[in-house]
Swiss-Prot record:
Protein name: E3 ubiquitin-protein ligase TM129
Cell location: Endoplasmic reticulum membrane
Coiled coil (UniProt feature): none
Domain free text: The RING-type zinc finger domain is responsible for E3 ubiquitin ligase activity.
Organism: Xenopus tropicalis (Western clawed frog)
Transmembrane segments: 7-27, 57-77, 95-115
Amino acid sequence: MESPEVTFTLAYVVFSVCFVFTPNEFHSAGITVQNLLSGWLGSEDVAFVHYHIRRSTATLLTHSLLPMGYFIGMCFAAPEKELYNVYKAADGWKVFVLITVLLPVTTSILAFYWSQKRWGNHPLAKTLAHHALPQSSWRAVASSINTEFRRIDKFATGAPSARVIVTDTWVMKVTTYRVDVAQQQDIHLTVTDSRQHELSPDSNTPVQFITIRVASVNPRVKPFDIRLNSTEYGELREKLHAPIRNAANVVIHQTLSDMFLETFKSLVEANQVYELSSNQELEPCIGCMQTNANIKLVKYCQEANEGECQQCYCRPMWCLTCMGKWFASRQDQQHPETWLSSHVPCPTCRAKFCIVDVCIVR
């Protein structure tokens, strides 16, 4: 049986990681800095900038107390170590105690410095000052952002720890400890990366995330990256004034069918290959007439007389892309989690098949 100190350590590590990175379960339970300190932070809708100035400061202070919380907990989980008496503790614990004291002291001094000049020393205030007119201040920029954030036509997406917000004038990225801000009229946007995941934890369907670099012509504004679901790409472009360059030649799937098609292709490419006899020639795909047909349906999923699938005797008449589009078009659009395991009729002879039966012709 594990000792209480090991159990407490594992539990506290899990709690700390979840408290810092705040998964959906912690948000639902209200175990976040924003919820615990909501009375002091105020309302994001009323004063967006001042809310995040306080939130980032409070988050830094709260997170700096986590090591101290662990030490206090260990005093109760392992009383035989007598950790409450620092002079009797081992050297390693003495160093840890020093760290637990220095962290909140340092962050408190930093928070006090940020709060001077009515929060004028805060990193967000300094960032906004780069966008202020010569005869103006960061507070004028903050007022503009606050006003535009209250409008219902803004674009907002992402997890609470990495939100992307686009208003008529501003592009903002809100993270745990900072807020990046760029003015729309000054920016260049470039798609730099794309990551596709076979399953989304929320919908149990394939999902593609794209990364866009936001670079300002203002040399004092640091570039930053925003990350969003490809299905939101079209809505983002409508809100942006500047075009988005695709420097990495990334294929962006803006619909669920686009993402399914990529998954369909990758699965078919892993299936068995159909060897075409030497006296047969491939004809153009009857679906698009732009490429040769390269798909043959052969029942490989089960024995000949078993299961729902049937043997198709059609010659190769469809290309992989058109067959994938046909497969997607026959699915229940309300239940995408069933697409990969479903059966559909052959577009020519109506014999039922599944993805395992789709073979590339060689």
